[in-house]
Structures are given as structure tokens and as C-alpha cells.
From Swiss-Prot:
Main location: membrane
Organism: Mycobacterium avium (strain 104)
Bias (Low complexity) ranges: 299-330
Enzyme class: transferase
InterPro entries: Lgt
One annotated GO biological process: lipoprotein biosynthetic process
Gene Ontology molecular-function annotations: phosphatidylglycerol-prolipoprotein diacylglyceryl transferase activity
Protein's UniProt name: Phosphatidylglycerol--prolipoprotein diacylglyceryl transferase
Membrane topology per record: Multi-pass membrane protein
Places the protein is found: Cell membrane
Length: 440
């Protein structure tokens, strides 16, 4: 017997008991792989423009469907172990924690669950698959450590230095068997085999790095990155299947997983070549949640009501201004009527009658100067009524003369319409001149 220079030992056991509860390494690594895939997928989904946390919502559909699909594929391809002569029976078929998941069934039925989740959130399934692809292959690599602890899915016997030692294990009932999942190693080597779990683990890690690099350099989208993951994994799985020697279903002397890997590889390559280039629009990855957050357009009735309210608010001050203007206009006739009341009280003499032509000339001369009276009305315009002291007649005579001198420059015909107070101003000047000429 050739003495090995080196060897790769198997773990002494694959299950620990916490009281009556068994803690299985296989289940722990499966859970760890799922968590890693979701964490990576969530970060990648957000980087592509999607909403953070959507991956976890869709995982509520994807993970259960994937576990059921993986178990169904395992039962379909290894049915003799459960229903063949001396099979373990239906009870063992449902004990998924004992190991036995087929990756192709997990991917196929998991895709159905992902489609349901994506449809409910309004996001495209190919984009979701691209974001999750690197995490899936990493989860597969972590899950292979569970096969290592279970001493399962190993290869043929070998004399290579890195060969894997398979120990005999004794279960709680005392039965010794290298395939015992609940047993503890006796320290006795049963055989040395190819560590196929390690080969596939390393290959999966290589695909994980390659996917990240290709996604960054080539900006793959529309499901093309997921297709690249499937094609790459099929190549590695096909090669590993050639080294395995465990119990499996064969077709024409070839393991069934080799057939599956071949056909799935062809389908992945065809999709990779036919899918659209580039990536999806980031806005399409936000789904129904983004649509709900968009502000709703105001209804026409609401817009009309708002416009009417604004119009009424503007019209109200204008109406108030018009009312104030009307009140002011109503007061002006009363003021203009005051001189008419004073006229009967002043008795005109014959001398005043003789001087009336002069006052008429003065009034005519004052008309060209009326633009000064048309300036904005101010309280100062009524000052001529306030002074009680009499000014020298010379001053009063000079003012009309100066104004009469300016008369030819501005014809009366070109003057704008007189202000409402114009007649009142003429009467006041006429009354003052008559009073001063009469010696009052």
C-alpha cells in the first residue's frame, strides 16, 4: 500500500446537538449562502438604479420556490435512494436538512418564484436575475462546504496528495458507516477520493470574480449576465461530473447531470447572443413603488376652482378701489356747488358789471395755465381758500399778465379734457378778482 505524502481530512462530524435540537452544518452553510446572495444582490440592485430592499421582498418568493425545486430535482434524479428496493421512503424524502438539493431544480423553480415577486413589484425579471447572478454562484460555493461536512458528493478514489480522506462514522445507535450523517468519526479512514466539492467550490469562486469583472467592463443587462453565469457554471459542472463516483442516475452510461449541463449550456449561449445589448433604463427598475411616489396631476375641477378663487381674490381689491373712486366723485359735485351758493350773497354793483369783461379776459388767460391745475390732486390745491390776508393788487395783476403772456404758446384746442374741479377754480379766481377790484 502506497503511503500518502499528504492528505485532506474530512470533518469528524456534520451535526451537533443543542439539547434535543440538532444543528446541522449543511443547513448552516445553505443559510449563509442565501444571506450572502441577498446582501450582494441588494447592493447591486441599488447600484443599477433599483430601490433598496426590493431584493428581500422578492426573496420571500424566490427562496422557498428554489428550495422546493432543488429538492424535487434531487428526488427525480436519485429516486432509487428513496423509492427503490431498500429505499429510505417518503419520510427521508421530505427531510431536506439531511442534504440533497439539485441546483438545476433550484434555479428553475426559483425563477418562477422570482417572476411572481417581480410581477408584483412591477420590475423586469431579467434585470433582477442580472443583479442576483454573482450572489447565486457565491451561495453555491458556500453551500459546497455543507457537502464537505456531510462527506457526500465526492469523486473517485485517488492517490493524489490533495486527496480527501473519508472516515467511518458511528451514529447514536452504534451503527458504523462512512455515509452516516448523524455519526461521529471513528478516526479510521475508509477511502481517499477526489475532493470534487473543493473543485466546484473553487470554480464557483472563479465564476463569481469573472461575473463582476464582465459586468463592470461590458455593462451586461437584459438577463445576459445571468446567462453568462449559467453557461460558466455548466462548463465547470460538466467537468466535475466526470470525476464523481457517488450513486446517481445514468443515461447511456452518462450521469444525468452531465446531460442537463450540456443542454442548459446551449440554451444559455443562445440567450446570451440573442438578448439586447446594454442595460435597462434605471427608471424601469423602480417598479410600482416609484410610480406611487410620483405626484398625481391635479384634476381639472380642482384647477378650475383654484383659478376662480384666485380671480375673485384679485377682483375684490379692484372693486374696492372702484367703490372708493365713486365715493370721491360723488363728493366732488358738492364741493363745486358751494361757490354757486355764495353767489347770491354777494351784491354786484355797476362797477363790478363794468369790470366783468376784464375778469372774463383773465379767465380766458388762465385757461392755458390749467395744466398746472391738472397735476395730481393734493390737499394743497385748495390753499387759495385759506389765506385771509389781502395781497397787493399789483401782485394779482402781475399773475394774469404773466399767464396771459404764455397763452399763445399753448392753444386751448390742444388741451386735454378739464379735470372735474376746473369750473370751481375759474369761479374762485373770478370771485377773488371781483372782490379785490370792488375793494372788499
Amino acid at each position: 500500500m502506497t503511503k500518502l505524502l499528504a492528505y485532506f481530512p474530512s470533518p469528524p462530524q456534520g451535526v451537533w446537538h443543542l439539547g434535543p435540537v440538532p444543528i446541522r452544518a449543511y443547513a448552516l452553510f445553505i443559510i449563509a449562502g442565501i444571506v450572502a446572495a441577498l446582501l450582494i444582490g441588494d447592493r447591486r440592485w441599488e447600484a443599477r438604479g433599483g430601490e433598496r430592499g426590493v431584493i428581500y421582498d422578492i426573496a420571500l418568493w424566490t427562496v422557498p420556490f428554489g428550495l422546493v425545486g432543488g429538492r424535487l430535482y434531487h428526488l427525480a434524479t436519485d429516486w432509487r435512494t428513496y423509492w427503490g428496493p431498500g429505499g429510505a421512503g417518503f419520510g427521508a424524502a421530505v427531510r431536506i436538512w439531511d442534504g440533497g438539493l439539485g441546483i438545476w431544480g433550484a434555479v428553475a423553480l426559483g425563477a418562477v418564484g422570482a417572476w411572481i415577486g417581480c410581477r408584483r413589484h412591477g420590475i423586469p425579471l431579467p434585470a433582477f436575475a442580472d443583479a442576483l447572478a454573482p450572489g447565486i454562484i457565491l451561495a453555491q460555493a458556500i453551500g459546497r462546504l455543507g457537502n464537505y461536512f456531510n462527506q457526500e458528493l465526492y469523486g473517485r478514489e485517488t492517490t493524489l496528495p490533495w486527496g480527501l480522506e473519508i472516515f467511518y462514522r458511528r451514529d447514536p445507535s452504534g451503527y458504523i458507516d462512512p455515509h452516516s450523517l448523524d455519526g461521529v468519526s471513528t478516526g479510521q479512514v475508509a477511502l481517499v477520493v477526489q475532493p470534487t466539492f473543493l473543485y466546484e467550490l473553487l470554480w464557483n469562486l472563479l465564476i463569481f470574480v469573472a461575473l463582476l469583472y464582465a459586468d463592470r467592463r461590458l455593462t451586461l443587462g437584459h438577463g445576459r449576465l445571468f446567462a453568462l453565469y449559467v453557461a460558466g457554471y455548466c462548463v465547470g459542472r460538466f467537468c466535475v461530473e466526470l470525476l464523481r463516483d457517488d450513486t446517481a442516475t445514468h443515461i447511456a452510461g452518462i450521469r444525468i447531470n452531465s446531460f442537463t449541463s450540456t443542454f442548459v449550456f446551449i440554451g444559455a449561449v443562445v440567450y446570451l447572443m440573442a438578448a439586447p445589448k446594454g442595460r435597462e433604463d434605471p427608471e424601469s427598475l423602480r417598479g410600482n413603488q416609484y410610480v406611487e411616489e410620483e405626484p398625481a396631476e391635479p384634476e381639472p375641477a380642482t384647477v378650475a376652482a383654484t383659478t376662480e378663487a384666485a380671480t375673485e381674490g384679485v377682483a375684490a381689491p379692484a372693486d374696492g378701489a372702484e367703490a372708493a373712486g365713486a365715493d370721491a366723485t360723488a363728493q366732488r359735485p358738492e364741493e363745486s356747488a358751494e361757490p354757486d351758493v355764495e353767489k347770491p350773497e354777494s351784491e354786484e354793483t355797476e362797477a363790478e358789471a363794468a369790470e366783468e369783461p376784464e375778469s372774463e379776459e383773465t379767465e380766458a388767460a388762465e385757461e392755458p395755465g390749467e395744466p398746472e391745475a391738472e397735476e395730481p390732486e393734493e390737499p394743497e390745491a385748495e390753499e387759495p381758500e385759506e389765506p385771509e390776508t389781502e395781497e397787493p393788487e399789483a401782485d394779482s395783476d402781475e399773475e394774469p399778465e404773466e399767464e396771459s403772456g404764455e397763452a399763445p404758446e399753448q392753444p386751448v384746442a390742444e388741451e386735454p379734457e378739464p379735470a372735474p374741479q376746473q369750473p370751481e377754480t375759474k369761479r374762485r379766481w373770478g370771485a377773488r378778482l371781483r372782490d379785490r377790484l370792488s375793494g372788499r
